């Protein structure tokens, strides 16, 4: 895909409007998880060091659109940036009719969702955003799947629209994993339901050499092989779909599983062959043989795309499958991309962050990209690059 990159532009003296993803959890006026801000800092620093007049904005939470609500203010983010950048960062509340900035100065524009017309991508608001800048930088992959005034409309109307370093890296990594992957490509899809990941599974079944399924999704595939899954979470109405997918793509299905009689953190894990699962059993994880077999598949992969844990890894007795998969990915010499909330939690839990080639910052956007959907913000950047 062809987009203009911020790093290729002359920024000195220019008014630069960065749409970042600063939607971070806040408690008692303090940022409690700074991962998204940390991811955005390099882009902000690059602009400041280049002598640009820098504006950065984001949404935060879900306020009623068009109404100011202190609970959803970006003020805690401004306080964080003051410390992180060791400079005076201002928060602008009324900015739609213009604001004055000096070169090397940073202003945070208050929560875009306080502006009426943001979510509906209204032209009037988009043009007001665009009038603030010489260069619009889209750097929020996490909201690239939404056509909103601050992610799409502004870019259509700004003098120049480009991809920030974070977004550019994301598109490059996902493109490398999906558009032109080194083979074999192994995709791992976990999660509770086939229905929520059906488009992902269908899309990946067409490009993956092997498609590994885990979590509740795997139970539907175990049932599709004719085995009893007891009281496990599975979708009987999607068994035929699972069988169809298994004909189209190599999907290694678990041969042994970790079961219990109740969904309980302290429940003892009972390892069983899939043919031995009883009517009152609930499958919560892969068994050791299945984990070892999948680890070997991952070990031979040249490209790995990972979305979702393969068991109830939050419970100590049912973490072995996801731990084994994580270890195999960490030890793999292949190019690995991971994304999705639960996946990131697993990466943190098993301490493999440094060993994954690329960790995606987007939840819904990551899934939509993997589904093969066009992301509106990316389509806008491609269109502007042609102009």
Swiss-Prot record:
UniProt entry tagged with the keyword ATP-binding: yes
Enzyme Commission designation: 2.7.2.3
One Pfam family per UniProt: PGK
Keyword rRNA processing set for record: no
Disulfide cross-links: none
Highest taxon listed in the record's lineage: Bacteria
Cellular localization per UniProt: Cytoplasm
Amino-acid positions noted as binding ATP in the UniProt annotation, renumbered to this chain: 197, 314, 340-343
Record keywords, A-Z: ATP-binding, Cytoplasm, Glycolysis, Kinase, Nucleotide-binding, Transferase
Record's catalysed reaction(s): (2R)-3-phosphoglycerate + ATP = (2R)-3-phospho-glyceroyl phosphate + ADP
Record-level GO BP terms: gluconeogenesis; glycolytic process
Pathway listed: Carbohydrate degradation; glycolysis; pyruvate from D-glyceraldehyde 3-phosphate: step 2/5
Residues in the signal sequence: none
Biological classification of the source: Bacteria, Pseudomonadati, Pseudomonadota, Gammaproteobacteria, Vibrionales
Organism expressing this protein natively: Aliivibrio fischeri (strain ATCC 700601 / ES114) (Vibrio fischeri)
One Gene Ontology cellular component annotation held by this UniProt entry: cytosol
Molecular function in Gene Ontology: ADP binding; ATP binding; phosphoglycerate kinase activity
Name under which the protein is recorded: Phosphoglycerate kinase
Known partners and oligomeric status: Monomer.
Family: Belongs to the phosphoglycerate kinase family.
Residues bound to substrate: 21-23, 36, 59-62, 113, 146
Major location (coarse): cytoplasm
């Amino acid at each position: 895909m062809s987009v203009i990159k911020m790093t290729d532009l002359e920024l000195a003296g220019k008014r630069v409007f960065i749409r970042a993803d600063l939607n971070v959890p806040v408690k008692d006026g303090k940022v409690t998880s700074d991962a998204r801000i940390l991811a955005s800092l390099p882009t902000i620093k690059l602009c400041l060091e280049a002598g640009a007049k820098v504006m950065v904005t984001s949404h935060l939470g879900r306020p009623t659109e068009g109404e100011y609500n202190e609970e959803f203010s970006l003020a805690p983010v401004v306080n964080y940036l003051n410390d992180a950048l060791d400079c005076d960062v201002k928060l602008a509340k009324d900015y739609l009719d213009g604001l004055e900035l000096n070169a090397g100065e940073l202003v945070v524009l208050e929560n875009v969702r306080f502006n009426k017309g943001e979510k509906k991508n209204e032209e009037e608001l988009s043009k007001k955003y665009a009038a603030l800048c010489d260069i619009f930088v889209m750097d929020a992959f996490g909201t690239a799947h939404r056509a909103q005034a601050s992610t799409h409309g502004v870019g259509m109307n700004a003098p120049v629209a480009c991809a920030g370093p974070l977004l550019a890296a994301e598109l490059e990594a996902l493109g490398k994993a999906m558009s032109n992957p080194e083979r074999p490509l192994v995709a791992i899809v976990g999660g509770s339901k086939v229905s929520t990941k059906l488009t992902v599974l269908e899309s990946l079944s067409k490009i993956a050499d092997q498609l590994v399924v885990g979590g509740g999704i795997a139970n539907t595939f175990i049932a599709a092989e004719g085995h009893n899954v007891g009281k496990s979470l599975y979708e009987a109405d999607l068994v035929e779909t699972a069988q169809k997918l298994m004909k189209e793509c190599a999907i290694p299905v678990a041969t042994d599983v970790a079961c219990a009689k109740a969904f309980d953190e302290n429940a003892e894990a009972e390892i069983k062959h899939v043919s031995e699962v009883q009517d009152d059993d609930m499958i919560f994880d892969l068994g050791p043989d299945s984990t070892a077999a999948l680890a070997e598949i991952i070990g031979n992969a040249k490209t790995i795309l990972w979305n979702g844990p393969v068991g109830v890894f939050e419970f100590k007795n049912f973490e072995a499958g996801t731990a084994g998969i994580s270890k195999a990915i960490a030890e793999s010499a292949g190019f690995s991309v991971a994304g999705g909330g639960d996946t990131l939690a697993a990466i943190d839990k098993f301490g493999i962050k440094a060993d994954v080639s690329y960790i995606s910052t987007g939840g819904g956007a990551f899934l939509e990209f993997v589904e093969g959907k066009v992301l509106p913000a990316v389509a806008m950047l491609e269109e502007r690059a042609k102009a």
